[in-house]
Amino acid sequence: MNTHSDFASRHIGPQGEERREMLDSLGYRTLDELIADIVPADIRMKAPLDLPAAKSETEALEELRSILRKNKLLKTFIGQGYYGTITPSVILRNVLENPGWYTAYTPYQPEIAQGRLEMLMNFQTMVSSLTGLPVANASLLDEGTAAAEAVTMCRNARPKANTFFVADTCHPQTISVIRTRAAFQGVNIIVGDCSSFDPASIGADLAGVLVQYPDTLGLICDYTDFFSRVHATGALCVVAADLMALTVIREPGAFGTDICIGNTQRFGIPMGFGGPHAAYMSCTDALKRRMPGRLIGMSIDTLGRPAYRLALQTREQHIRRDKATSNICTAQVLLAVLAAFYAVYHGQEGLKRIGTEIHLKTKSLYKVLTEAGIAIENKNFFDTLLLSVPGQADAMVQKALEAGYNIRRVDADHAAISLDETATCADIAALASALAGAETSAACDCDAPAWDPVHTRQTPFCTEKAFNSYHSETEMMRYIRRLESRDLALNEAMIPLGSCTMKLNAASEMIPITWPEANALHPFVPADQSEGIREMLSILSDRLAKITGFAAVSLQPNAGAAGEYAGLLAIRRYQKHAGEGHRNVCLIPTSAHGTNPASSAMAGLKVVPVKCDERGNIDMADLKSQAEAHKDNLSCIMVTYPSTHGVYEQTIKELCDIVHANGGQVYMDGANMNAQVGLTCPGCIGADVCHLNLHKTFAMPHGGGGPGIGPIGVAEHLVPFLPGHLTLGHEEGAVASAAWGSASIAAICWMYLSMMGPDGLREATEMAILNANYIAKKLGHLFPVLYSGNKGLVAHECILDPRQLTHDAGLTVDDIAKRLMDYGFHGPTMSFPVPGTLMVEPTESEPKKELDRFIEAMERIHAEITAIINGTADKEDNVLKNSPHTAEMVSADEWRHPYSRSEAAYPVSGLLIHKFWPYVGRVDNVYGDRNLVCTCDTVEEFSKAVEL
């Protein structure tokens, strides 16, 4: 085969002689022999994957482009939460197309993630400033999900209240997602008119209200009086606000808002046929501990210098499990970073200018249409005009279409036009001519705002230094580069995080996401305009169904945790349809990922834990006992396979049989699908539903904490209960704002499957298993492998157990992870699934040279620990407890440690050739939570505050 077209050999690390050496170290002659001893025979696939043969990178790109060219790219002014944008080229080139930004992991290790964390702090500051509320999180999945999270937040604040009011002028897709969330949580959703709704009539049972601002039909309302009446009942007020509008109209915090949610898509992010986009949430200080998602805070490092970190993590699923504020894990970090850079680049004045231009162009269109005799119902508007055209809405939409524009059909009597930053005066002239036969000059008639002065924003925003320093491209380019250099991503080193599958995100896979054919479509365009992208999505869904052995796949969920939630809802809706809606018990092994119990709680399920035995496997006797004890109410079991302990459990089919025999369904967590593809599948095993993490198994990048896609595959009987959507003709079960979720980035996985082919996919799985076993073998004599299968082998990851060593040396597992930074590595997964251990997953992409470099680092760290235990190294002042060592630390004039500077920074000779420096010393987590700062001006300003 021509090596220039053999993508699998580019994707998979070890080749030829390297593989033979690795197999020899394990005592095997062939990869097939190794796999036969690891994967249980009774779950092996009987035939190869029924997928097209692998294509070269060039062939795959050409085929995908030919499919996407079937789309029709018209200028779209539909609005309804999605708008045309202009992504500054300096951001596109240096961030979105840069693996230094898109291949990093969630910033759990802040010392090697300061660049991303600074931008997320900028994002929070931007949102807080624009909405007028003091605390903002670091992104949510989309606007609909954010609204649903706000409903939950209100209920948590008022646990005895079971009613929530949603204004009927909120975006329809948002209302659908809220209804889905409420269905199994006992929340009564009232959708109605704010002007006629009396909060006092609900009284103490009212948890909160949600309004859109401006509303979905373009009207800017003053909610001051309405919110006063809501607050009189003790309920909370939520606003879904357009951030671009907030550059010129009054901020929600000014009229009594408790929680503000929305989307940052207008800040330079393409519509993407629905996504991905970074939603936001801000709130009052009193509600900050109830907020879902990541929250970035400021703390200090060991030298007392300011440092960013993830704050208030005890709210989150990986700690609180079924008591968490949300199941959110992967969010939309990369998109939040892009939106924040957009705000940094434009600054306050630039954003105000863009917002003002959008509004004044809308006013120009208003003027010419009304002069031509078309009635427009909303007089207070920002960017959206509601045309009153009795019986003529379809005709108006068709006229616009013939002129090359999409506008929104509201109902038979109304159409709406929402302008954006891409709108030109020529567009206004063309629309006026098409809709009203009116002639207007190409120059817009721009003057004063068209809203009541009470709606005008009076307060400044984004006044912080970050938003007022980088407005030339040179400055911006260098700022981006400085921040990138502070983060360790896959373009620097292996990230061996267990359960995270940090594999290669190949350049050819990433290229299509910047094509207009993939990212420029509005999710609600007419079907004949989206034939290409829907064909691509259909092909991807079909291939994923074949890989999983299921009847159908939905791509709607925007992350793995969202997929879990969607899968559980499919089970619950199926059982309700079958007259078994009372089934509400979910069995979950104690080793499960924290999202499992959190998602179960969101789906209205009662979590019943199942024990694990001394070998880390599910205790089958306890499983059988629990299943039988709860058989009348058993809804499902959530099980990860291979297990979160890195083992192919031999009894997995028996587990499925026990649950089915007691009336339950089997939900398989697909976090470890990288050890299944091409060898076995959820359908072979007996599962009824499984979510996939496209940002793990199928080569989509993690983006530093998102975006992701968490599609769910289901067996035949669950197909009718997959997520619906307004655009699909049935909205029940919608879990995202768009029918296909983050559709544009699904192209990444389409490319991966096309270039790998069935043989490459199977080989990738086999090599992931080989790499993990190689590491386990090489390090097991120093750090015992906690769990393994019957023949002492692991799956695609292994748990190294340093607990005896750390105990004897007076260390913690954190000390090992921080010390690995000095060797140029991101630490493995800690605290999950076994506290105090290290879960290592190398993936198939890492070459033997990188595996050996990691092994060498761990061997040296073992020696460093041993030196502490035997007394040759100081128990308190040593390389582990003081790690990571920054360039500033080792170059300081004064050095008082009992070990040398070279031992601190260059413990192995390979680091002399290339060295990654942690930007800050070890971050003080306790200080950060006790002195919570989630928005800031600059590091320098915070530093002055620390000194005081």
Predicted regions and their residues:
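TRNA-binding/sensing appendages of the translation machinery
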Residues: Y28-D42, T257-G262, A687-C690
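A structural preference for short, hydrophobic beta-strand core positions in alpha/beta folds
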Residues: N137, V191, V239, N378-K379, ...
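Non-catalytic terminal extensions of PLP-dependent enzymes
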Residues: M1-S25, A36-F77, I86-Y102, Y108-E111, ...
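N-terminal export/assembly segments and adjacent metallocofactor-ligating motifs
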Residues: T106-R116, N122-Q124, N137-S139
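Alpha-helix N-cap recognition
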Residues: T30, D142-E143, G391, S472
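A conserved hydrophobic secondary-structure block that centers on an alpha-helix together
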Residues: M126-G144, K160, F164
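Conserved phosphate/anionic-ligand binding catalytic regions in large, soluble enzymes, centered on
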Residues: I269-S282, A286-L287, A331-L335, S418, ...
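Conserved PLP-enzyme active-site core in the AAT-like
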Residues: G115, T145-A307, L369-G373, F382, ...
